[in-house]
Amino acid sequence: YVTALLVKTLRSAGYDVGYYKAAISGARTVEESDAGFVNRFAQIREPEDMLLSYLYQNAVSPHLAARIEGNPVEKDVIMSAWERVTAAYPYVTMEGSGGIMCPIRHDEKAVYYLEDIIRWLRLPVLVIADAGLGTINRVVTTCEYIRRRNISVKGIILNHWKGGVMEEDNVEMIEEITGVKVLARVKKGDTALDIDPETIISLYE
């Protein structure tokens, strides 16, 4: 949902932004998946075969879905897909699958986590997290892990924002501990991000 808001905000401002996700589980078709939702919501009209490389029906982690369905993620497929989508759009948002350590493939031939895909594609990261109780620890540990892998953290967006003293304090503590700015707060039903498009587009540089 946050990725859809991000892409829609930029496209509404006139930026030609595409979308890509390496693997999605828990959907029967691309149309039913997160990728299909982003494509519709942000009005990208991107061909389905450019949106997504691997679609798994089982609603489990991609590595397990791949094992069950016999279709493991291959690095060369991801690299080729990324080359194609970046050739079609000057800006591309890649949505992650789960958290930074989400297993994408884990078998006797190869072991990949989300962080591996990020490093293959040489991408910076925007951390998306729930705004509520427990988010300070989750965001701080995620940012610290990402930095230890020499991946740039461009900013943080807090989802399911309700407001109040606890969530405002979460923002202050996260920014103080990580040194990374909370760029936006997303409430249920929001149709755009509360951040100007120029700030968002600068994250792609």
Predicted regions and their residues:
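Hydrophobic anchor at the start of a short beta-strand
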Residues: D16-V17, V92, V125, V153-K154
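N-terminal phosphate/diphosphate-binding loop that engages ATP/GTP or pyrophosphate donors
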Residues: Y1-P72, D76, A81-R84
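Switch II (G3) loop of P-loop NTPases
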Residues: I78, W82-A110
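Inter-motif core of Ras-like GTPase G domains
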Residues: D107-A131
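Histidine-anchored nucleotide/phosphate-binding helix
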Residues: A4-R11, L114-I118, N137-R147
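Charged helix-capping and loop-helix junction motifs
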Residues: D107-E115, V140-T141, E167-E172
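C-terminal lobe/tail of nucleotide-utilizing enzymes
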Residues: C143-E205
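Short internal beta-strands
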Residues: K21, L126-A129, K154-H160
